[in-house]
Regions:
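Intrinsic-disorder-driven secretion/translocation and chaperone-binding regions of pathogen effectors
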Residues: 1-4, 288-292
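Short basic alpha-helical hairpin corresponding to helix-turn-helix/winged-helix-like nucleic-acid-binding
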Residues: 139-150, 154-174
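Acidic-basic catalytic patches of nuclease active cores, encompassing PD-(D/E)XK
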Residues: 163-198
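Catalytic cores of nucleic-acid endonucleases
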Residues: 225-289
């Protein structure tokens, strides 16, 4: 299906699996024991050590990693849509989002945290919120509650933490939106029998940005996909002066929230009417397309 070798999001280190299991258990609202809080604090310290050893990345390196990771995840989700029911696809997307937040977004944002006092509690709290966004802090371990007291009483701590957390969430949501948008495009192109193919990694970023190729009437057409949170189920399509099709796809990271899963399901498993409309729009643009 592809001639590229995309970067994979590695599996979570074992300590993150333990941390994830613990915060999920804490999220049930059960009383947090002293031993649980101690383990959680230890996990946060391990996380700090893990984050501190991540290399500093340039903006260009981050863009290239993001682009390759998106392609890797699109491939995985496309395969899942062939083999698994929607609940399993949605579950995998949420897992991908969490791994990306922990293994990519946290280290990037963490580069500016060197001057933060009590770093363990700081990251402890962020990990709890990242892994368990729907859980009230009243269910958090003691180390998190202690930090929340500082957060409420110290404006500097509050400002720094909010900036850091917002950076992590912004990076994650922007990337997840890209994954969803490109997956939705790929599914539509598949259903419309346009034979979508991945471009090379070198064309994923930069001035000659090409995400995919589609084939219609024996012509190979370059495509750039842009994800946005506007519009409807039918992407907008426009041909640019370079001959690329610019396809704008409606996608939202909020669709990973269980209460909004129906929107995600409709996007990943499009109706015949949606597919036919998409195919007609592509053909309309290609009627003006001249292969150089």
């Amino acid at each position: 299906m592809s001639d590229i070798t995309p970067i994979e999001i590695p599996p979570l280190p074992q300590n993150f699996h333990e941390l994830n299991k613990l915060v999920r258990e804490l999220g049930t609202g059960a009383e947090t024991s002293t031993e649980d809080a101690k383990i959680f604090t230890q996990m946060a310290q391990i996380a700090c050590n893990y984050l501190e050893h991540q290399p500093t990345l340039s903006d260009q390196e981050i863009k290239e990693i993001h682009a390759s990771l998106i392609k890797s995840c699109v491939q995985k989700i496309i395969e899942l849509t062939k083999e698994q029911p929607f609940p399993e696809v949605a579950k995998e997307l949420r897992g991908i989002s969490t791994r990306f937040a922990l293994l990519v977004c946290l280290p990037i944002a963490y580069q500016n945290l060197n001057q933060i006092p009590q770093k363990s509690s700081f990251v402890d709290t962020l990990l709890f919120c990242t892994l368990n966004e729907q859980t009230p802090l009243s269910s958090a371990p003691n180390s998190v509650r202690s930090f929340v007291q500082k957060y409420n009483s110290d404006p500097k701590v509050r400002e720094t933490y909010d900036t850091f957390k917002n950076k992590v969430i912004s990076l994650r949501d922007s990337w997840v939106q890209g994954v969803l948008g490109e997956t939705i495009f790929f599914r539509l192109a598949q259903e419309a029998e346009l034979n979508p193919q991945f471009s090379s990694p070198q064309k994923d970023v930069g001035a000659q940005h090409v995400d995919y190729y589609i084939t219609c009437n024996d012509k190979k057409i370059p495509v750039q996909v842009k994800s946005c949170q506007e519009g409807n189920a039918i992407p907008t399509i426009q041909k640019d002066f370079k001959g690329r099709l610019l396809i704008k796809v409606n996608a939202s990271p909020n669709w990973l929230i269980p209460s909004q899963e129906e929107k995600l399901k409709q996007a990943l498993f499009p109706s015949p009417e949606t597919v036919n409309t998409f195919f007609a729009l592509v053909n309309e643009q290609l009627s003006y397309y001249h292969n150089p």
